[in-house]
Amino acid sequence: MQAGIHPEYNEVVFQDISTGETFLTRSTIEKTSGDTITLDGKEYPLVRIEVSSASHPFFTGKQSLVDTEGRVEKFRQKYGMRK
């Protein structure tokens, strides 16, 4: 392996913003914000995600509409659909 060309592989915590569930894993993701979280006495970078296995209908078995950016409402307004 050549030195200096590979991304850093560090421990990161992903947090599902709809359920609050946290997942500790390793990733090459860059630290985009200064958010950190402390788990088991150690501090990790925090990445917030909208959908994970804790909230996705396929994994939870529940049909629910996850729309954090208003896409569904925009579609309904555009095509005249009612709830």
Swiss-Prot record:
Disulfide bonds: none
Keyword Transcription recorded: no
One GO CC term, this protein: ribosome
GO process terms (BP): translation
Function: Binds the 23S rRNA.
Family listed: Belongs to the bacterial ribosomal protein bL31 family. Type B subfamily.
This protein's name: Large ribosomal subunit protein bL31B
Native species: Hydrogenovibrio crunogenus (strain DSM 25203 / XCL-2) (Thiomicrospira crunogena)
